[in-house]
Amino acid sequence: MSVAEIRKSAETRMAKSLDTLKVNLSKIRTGRAHTGILDHVQVEYYGSPVPVSQVANVNLVDARTISVQPYEKPMAAAIEKAIRESDLGLNPMSLGDSIRVPMPALTEERRRDLTKVVKGEGEDAKIAVRNLRREANESLKKLVKDKEISEDDERRAQDDIQKLTDRNVTEIDKLITQKEAEIMTV
């Protein structure tokens, strides 16, 4: 493995960690409605679990209400049940062939709990990025040991990887700060 391959691998894997964080943060409910909140809710469809977005049209009615329009009318009850049983704390209302999902206002205590969850997700992402840095540095040390690169090249590559790590950690901090602000906004 060359220095460029090690750097590229670290960069790709760090980007995946960042993407995972973004997905995890999008699942955390804020006071506002957004269609992405139902993305990970699974509904039983002909014996197999599928995301709600594949069996229904999910739209925003207003800042606090989501409308779910099933493609097949009989699916309405199953979708309503799946949303109610999800860990999101939502209480969907059936309107015949469609479902309204009002977003309850978050209490101050719930907001604080959610910010702790957000910080935890951010810390997990930072740990993942730092572990990737460590793996990349170990790979570089192995190249030096096998006399494939000089110690100067190793130091330069380690500096590159450190800059990459710093950039990703800064991006993680930015995402966490944005999400916390979103949660704490009443």
Swiss-Prot record:
UniProt keyword Transferase present: no
GO biological process, one term: cytoplasmic translational termination
GO terms of molecular function: ribosomal large subunit binding
Main localization (coarse): cytoplasm
Superkingdom of origin: Bacteria
Signal peptide location: none
Stored CDD domains: RRF (cd00520)
Keyword Thylakoid applies: no
Cellular compartments annotated: Cytoplasm
GO cellular component terms given for this protein: cytosol
Keywords noted in UniProt: Cytoplasm, Protein biosynthesis
Family note: Belongs to the RRF family.
HAMAP family in UniProt: RRF
Function statement: Responsible for the release of ribosomes from messenger RNA at the termination of protein biosynthesis. May increase the efficiency of translation by recycling ribosomes from one round of translation to another.
Name of the protein in question: Ribosome-recycling factor
Organismal lineage: Bacteria, Pseudomonadati, Pseudomonadota, Betaproteobacteria, Burkholderiales
